[in-house]
Amino acid sequence: MTAGRVNPYSIVSSEEDGLRLTTMPGINGFGNGKIHTRRKCRNRFVKKNGQCNVEFTNMDDKPQRYIADMFTTCVDIRWRYMLLLFSLAFLVSWLLFGLIFWLIALIHGDLENPGGDDTFKPCVLQVNGFVAAFLFSIETQTTIGYGFRCVTEECPLAVFMVVVQSIVGCIIDSFMIGAIMAKMARPKKRAQTLLFSHNAVVAMRDGKLCLMWRVGNLRKSHIVEAHVRAQLIKPRITEEGEYIPLDQIDIDVGFDKGLDRIFLVSPITILHEINEDSPLFGISRQDLETDDFEIVVILEGMVEATAMTTQARSSYLASEILWGHRFEPVLFEEKNQYKVDYSHFHKTYEVPSTPRCSAKDLVENKFLLPSTNSFCYENELAFMSRDEDEEDDDSRGLDDLSPDNRHEFDRLQATIALDQRSYRRESEI
């Protein structure tokens, strides 16, 4: 079985140029009445990497609200800004308490008598200026304790400020460590190793028209209680004339039957049956080329290492849904284990037998389904693999024959008629 048999079944590239074909009537109705044009796709509500394409503006009291929830703000901001914020917090606290100690020394007269009078006892030893007071503040808050500068019992206010600075330093340290640990332990980055296919496909599955997309896990650690859900987002005008720019409609992926809960060890194809309850029930292949909607897909579960919930998101525009395609197989059995080849994860192949009409027309018997034994690419790969194994076994068996036995085998092979059934295509079997 040669590779030339699969040439009619093209592989679709995952790269999209952001444009799609639309149709419009021809001039004066001549010709086939269709002129192919290109128009720009709608803006995404959810980007392919899962980020929401939303910008908030004109928010009242935004800074005050963010400061009131300081911990969440520190966890959500970027690392560079968080480290800069804590560095500024430490620097401001050192400068503030350094200024306080300098003022205490100035009021007590420590700066006027740096060491000339042996009977004079300063509030803080070896603090003769602002720089020395600043260094004493750093040593106090960080508990370095070089030993040259220390507070005496001469000034109770200085002793009290040492206690206050120690407490403030502990609060800043605790807040910083907690924010850093919370930011590092967030399961958000776990979504970087959860993969969605670049395209969704529409094809027949068990005699029903279905929308399918593929999800995969790049890590060997499992996603516990993994489940999927999807929503269709498109503009809608209500019966009262109200325009809803982003109307969200749930897409059933088997919630009632428990099919939305998956065991994500190898890549899995998520399936949505296009039936009477589906928002895609009346959409045909031609409608898909001109329609304006977006399907947001969500994968949720708990990280096995931390038991924290993570969520991975992606979306498919109408131009990214391939009608009449199926995903290439990625799971193969090799020796005593299964092998997942992610080089085929995003690739699809065309299924010409897929009806072009909508599921609604299909239910109303407006389209005659092809034979259920139509050619299948996965079966072709399986047959190729089986035939190669059989050819290897046959070749090894022929090599073991003696010259006399080989001559007898060639003579019998030339006289015995071959079984024609073994040379028919799968669609004829």
Curated annotation (Swiss-Prot):
UniProt GO cellular component terms: membrane; monoatomic ion channel complex; plasma membrane; T-tubule
Residues that coordinate or bind K(+) 2: 143-144
Cited SUPFAM superfamilies: E set domains, Voltage-gated potassium channels
Motif (Selectivity filter): 143-148
GO biological process: potassium ion import across plasma membrane; potassium ion transport; protein homotetramerization; regulation of monoatomic ion transmembrane transport
Side of membrane Cytoplasmic, spans: 1-76, 184-429
Membrane side Extracellular: residue ranges: 104-129, 147-155
Intramembrane segments: 130-146
Residues covered by region (Disordered): 386-407
Residues at which a 1,2-diacyl-sn-glycero-3-phospho-(1D-myo-inositol-4,5-bisphosphate) binds: 78, 80, 183, 188
Binding site for K(+) 1: 143
KW Calcium (keyword) present: no
GO terms assigned for molecular function: identical protein binding; inward rectifier potassium channel activity
Biased composition (Basic and acidic residues): 395-407
Catalytic activities: K(+)(in) = K(+)(out)
Chain segments annotated as transmembrane: 77-103, 156-183
Binding positions (K(+) 4): 145-146
Gene3D superfamilies: 1.10.287.70, G protein-activated inward rectifier potassium channel 1 (2.60.40.1400)
UniProt record similarity statement: Belongs to the inward rectifier-type potassium channel family.
PANTHER family the UniProt entry points to: ATP-SENSITIVE INWARD RECTIFIER POTASSIUM CHANNEL 12-RELATED (PTHR11767:SF14), INWARD RECTIFIER POTASSIUM CHANNEL (PTHR11767)
Role of this protein: Inward rectifying potassium channel that probably participates in controlling the resting membrane potential in electrically excitable cells. Probably participates in establishing action potential waveform and excitability of neuronal and muscle tissues. Inward rectifier potassium channels are characterized by a greater tendency to allow potassium to flow into the cell rather than out of it. Their voltage dependence is regulated by the concentration of extracellular potassium; as external potassium is raised, the voltage range of the channel opening shifts to more positive voltages.
Summary of subunit composition and partner proteins: Homotetramer.
The name this protein goes by in its record: ATP-sensitive inward rectifier potassium channel 12
Biological source species: Gallus gallus (Chicken)
Gene responsible for this protein: KCNJ12
